[in-house]
């Protein structure tokens, strides 16, 4: 008989509860990309397996992997016959043209009765409710769930388990678990992304193959040089290697007690593309360790033979990433020596290769507003410049990139007075809102009610819930919501939002389909510097021996960048929370094609990385072009386009609009 451990966890209100730790207190969750891998994982001791169909999941590169519909049913039956649960991944973004197939697939999954479906796209939540689907729902890690307010919102839609964001420490996770009571799944072994989940768009924009749609080309495994952006000088010549973003593989084998005591229920192994033998080895090794701890926690010690098995059969070297604190350079495989496969190599980003875009018909939307121009800025001076140049809305606040400082309450008050009668002032919020950010936002939102701003831009479900609870201001969704279809916008409207910003990864066709079917106005970015990924890592600190939070100001405020092998320079901007925002090498510019976007609810300029003077000139040019279009004329002027090119701090291009569509999920 198993010994049982009584574990006490402090609840927020100060009440203790007890949980008897036994064999079913922890789930060992194995991946399966083939029938053989599934049966091997089950035979080795997995409590549950997760796998994907031939479409709508995050592992679509290999045609020989994943399960067709008939095999899915057989897999469910096989797992249940062996008293093992089976979860099906439906965890990528779904475009409008794929929605009919999604309906059919959901109906089929409801028939074959897996134990849960893993989801990312809000459209799935909408359809599950509409269709009466009764299969339990778990959030995918791609939903980037990282605060308790998002959990409370997701519970309203029947979510019973979350795969937590990889950036959470175990101490944060324990508090998170205690406050929400939600079941927690945690990636504890395997390949990890260096970007925050769901917030890397590099592959989708560059190759038309979105990491959010199961086709990541792994730009993070490219070699890069760290440079001084202003001088071009290489700063990391003494670095162990050029693979600055190549995170090592997660391995929590030596930390199983810490995982269990943090309240993790499901121990998730990554590896749906791995062989049956590889999966069996991992599962059996972790099975023995978990069972040994549960049987006798006080007498438990790491089985070094098991560790030797994992170490000798590793793909990359191992790391615990954020489990016990901020990762450092030792967590990155900079030499690239153990990298098993390179999916792509550096190429130049798209310029104005616009044959596809020029051939498209314009958007059509009844009652579309008359050329509303919004501008996101980084400083008070840039905000005033945007107002003076003719912006209808300015987005202010949120992340502040060094050397700029965060906005103060008095800055908002002054700008509201300055813009009165000329432009709306909408407050931006950080894209990522962990415990610190949420605490700060609660106080900030309470103050906003008296300042007179015109609205709030939110970047995740938790911030949405806070804004709707603590203010009476209009709330709109930023591009970080990864809006890829009109049903996701329906979801946002049901939750009180007034406008949604489209994903950067959409092609023009896909954006047009959303705009023409959406129940809310849709905003799209038409010009500006935009981020390829956001990372909770400090890349300058990883490469520069003298760099730390206590470094000299000239080191902290220097502008850093990564240079890829194609010569592209990717700016690195560090915000007040220490996160690193990596930019594309070319800024987006859709000036020559504005007439195509006539159905938009708002045309947006991303000027957060621009000076006040550059911001003013860009806004004036777009204001004039949009006004000409509104009057029925031609918006384009060659001299204006030339001027945009001259003043741009980076080369210009059209990003994902070079593609007819982001490669599909079916």
Protein language model regions, located:
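Extended, well-folded interaction surfaces typified by the phenylalanyl-tRNA synthetase beta subunit core
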Residues: 159-161, 168, 181-182, 499
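Active-site pocket-lining/capping segments in soluble small-molecule metabolic enzymes
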Residues: 17-145, 172-266, 273-491, 495, ...
């Amino acid at each position: 008989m198993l010994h049982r451990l009584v574990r006490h966890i402090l609840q927020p209100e100060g009440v203790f509860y007890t949980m008897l730790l036994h064999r079913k207190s922890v789930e060992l969750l194995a991946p399966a990309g083939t029938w053989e891998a599934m049966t091997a994982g089950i035979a080795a001791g997995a409590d549950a397996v997760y796998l994907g169909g031939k479409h709508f999941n995050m592992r679509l590169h290999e045609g020989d992997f994943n399960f067709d519909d008939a095999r899915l049913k057989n897999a469910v039956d096989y797992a249940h016959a062996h008293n093992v649960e089976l979860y099906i991944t439906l965890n990528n973004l779904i475009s409008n043209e794929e929605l009919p197939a999604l309906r059919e697939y959901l109906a089929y999954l409801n028939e074959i009765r897996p134990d849960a479906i893993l989801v990312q796209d809000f459209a799935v939540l909408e359809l599950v409710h509409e269709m009466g689907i009764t299969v339990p729902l778990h959030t995918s890690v791609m939903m980037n769930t990282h605060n308790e307010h998002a959990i409370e919102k997701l519970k309203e839609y029947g979510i019973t388990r979350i795969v937590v964001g990889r950036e959470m420490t175990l101490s944060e996770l324990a508090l998170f678990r205690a406050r929400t009571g939600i079941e927690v799944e945690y990636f504890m072994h395997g390949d990890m992304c260096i970007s925050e989940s769901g917030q890397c768009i590099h592959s989708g924009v560059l190759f038309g193959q979105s990491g959010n749609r199961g086709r990541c080309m792994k730009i993070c495994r490219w070699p890069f040089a760290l440079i001084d952006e202003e001088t071009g000088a290489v700063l990391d010549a003494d670095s162990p290697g050029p693979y600055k973003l190549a995170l090592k593989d997660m391995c929590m084998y030596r930390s199983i007690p810490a995982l269990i005591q943090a309240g993790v229920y499901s121990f998730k192994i990554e590896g749906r593309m791995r062989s049956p033998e590889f999966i069996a080895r991992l599962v059996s090794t972790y099975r023995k360790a978990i069972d040994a701890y549960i049987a006798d926690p006080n007498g438990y010690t790491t089985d070094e033979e098991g560790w030797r098995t994992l170490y000798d059969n590793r793909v990359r070297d191992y790391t615990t990433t954020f489990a016990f604190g901020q990762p450092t350079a030792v967590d990155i495989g900079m030499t690239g020596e153990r990298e098993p496969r390179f999916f792509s190599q550096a190429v130049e980003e798209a310029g104005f290769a616009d044959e596809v875009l020029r051939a498209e018909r314009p958007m059509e939307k009844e009652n579309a507003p008359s050329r509303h121009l919004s501008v996101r800025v980084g400083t008070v001076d840039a905000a005033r410049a945007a107002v003076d140049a003719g912006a209808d809305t300015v987005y202010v606040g949120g992340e502040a990139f060094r050397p700029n400082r965060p906005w103060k309450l008095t800055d908002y008050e002054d700008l509201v007075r300055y813009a009165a009668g000329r432009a709306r002032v909408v407050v931006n919020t950080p894209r990522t809102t962990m415990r610190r950010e949420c605490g700060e936002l609660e106080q900030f939102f309470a103050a906003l009610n008296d300042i007179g701003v015109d609205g709030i831009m939110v970047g995740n479900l938790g911030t949405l819930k806070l804004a709707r609870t603590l203010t009476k201001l209009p709330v709109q969704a930023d591009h970080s919501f990864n809006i890829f279809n009109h049903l996701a916008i329906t979801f946002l409207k049901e939750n009180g939002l007034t406008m949604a910003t489209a994903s950067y990864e959409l092609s023009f066709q896909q954006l047009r389909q959303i705009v023409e079917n959406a129940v809310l106005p849709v905003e799209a970015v038409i010009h500006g510097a935009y981020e390829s990924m956001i990372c909770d890592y400090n890349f300058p600190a990883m490469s520069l021996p003298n760099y730390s939070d206590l470094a000299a100001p000239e080191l902290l405020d220097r502008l850093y960048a990564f240079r890829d092998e194609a010569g592209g320079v990717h700016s690195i901007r560090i915000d007040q929370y220490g996160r690193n925002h990596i930019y594309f090498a070319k800024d987006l510019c859709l000036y020559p094609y504005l007439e195509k976007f006539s159905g938009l609810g708002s045309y947006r300029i991303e000027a957060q990385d621009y000076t006040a003077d550059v911001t003013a000139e860009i806004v004036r040019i777009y204001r004039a072009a949009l006004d000409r279009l509104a009057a029925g004329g031609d918006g384009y002027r060659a001299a204006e386009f030339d001027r945009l090119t001259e003043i741009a701090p980076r080369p210009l291009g059209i990003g994902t609009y070079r593609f007819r569509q982001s490669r599909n999920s079916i």
